[in-house]
């Protein structure tokens, strides 16, 4: 019988980001209770030796599973030390991988109070609406002018510690272009 391979997307992440993610998840599960329905699985509860943790986030009938890995092959850069994250959406027997932005939107939709564009319609109909968003990471686009005007009236409340964002966890902070202070360019390239 031949080998069958299964390919999955694993976002390379440094271990400090993973530690921060885990501590934020645990804080909001056990202290603030904003994520009390989430389930945290430790590495010693997992049958797979490369999984360092799993966070199971119920989304109605579906579930979002964020797995962190260790002991992976290192990347092309020195700081890619074999740590990674995969994000999976499951419903019954179907599962698919999702990107961090979509994961944050799903978490936002199910768990955190938000003053969204739908709130304008609800307010006109006389329904009680939340006047601020607790989970800013769940918004991927700029809102309408009405939405921006209404949010300008109410300053966003900073939550300490912040809510765990999957997008922030997988953000590539090393490959952003670096800016050097006080240099207009290379002297050899400028001809000076």
Curated annotation (Swiss-Prot):
Motif HCCH motif, which positions?
108-139
Q: GO biological process: any one?
A: viral life cycle
**How the protein sits in the membrane?**
Peripheral membrane protein
Q: Which InterPro entries match?
A: Vif (IPR000475)
Top-rank taxon: Viruses
Q: Where is this region: Interaction with host APOBEC3G?
A: 40-44
Q: Which UniProt keywords apply?
A: AIDS, Host cell membrane, Host cytoplasm, Host membrane, Host-virus interaction, Membrane, Metal-binding, Phosphoprotein, RNA-binding, Ubl conjugation, Ubl conjugation pathway, Virion, Zinc
- Check the UniProt entry and state the signal peptide residues, or none: none
Name recorded for this polypeptide:
Virion infectivity factor
Which species does this protein come from? Answer: Human immunodeficiency virus type 1 group M subtype D (isolate Z2/CDC-Z34) (HIV-1)
Originating gene: vif
């Amino acid at each position: 019988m031949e080998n069958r391979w299964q390919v999955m997307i694993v976002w390379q992440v440094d271990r400090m980001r993973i530690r921060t993610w885990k501590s934020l998840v645990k804080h909001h599960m056990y202290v603030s209770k904003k994520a009390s329905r989430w389930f945290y699985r430790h590495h010693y509860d997992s049958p797979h030796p490369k999984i360092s943790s799993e966070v199971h986030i119920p989304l109605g009938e579906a579930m979002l599973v964020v797995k962190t890995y260790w002991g992976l092959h290192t990347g092309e850069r020195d700081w890619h030390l074999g740590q990674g994250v995969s994000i999976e959406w499951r419903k019954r027997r179907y599962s698919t991988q999702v990107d961090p932005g979509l994961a944050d939107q799903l978490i936002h939709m199910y768990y955190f109070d938000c003053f969204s564009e739908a709130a304008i319609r609800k307010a006109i109909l006389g329904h009680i609406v939340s006047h601020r968003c607790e989970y800013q990471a769940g918004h991927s686009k700029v809102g309408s002018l009405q939405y921006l005007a209404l949010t300008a009236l109410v300053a966003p409340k900073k939550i300490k510690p912040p809510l765990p964002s999957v997008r922030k966890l997988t953000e590539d902070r090393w490959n952003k272009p670096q800016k050097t202070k006080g240099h207009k360019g290379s002297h050899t390239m400028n001809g000076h």
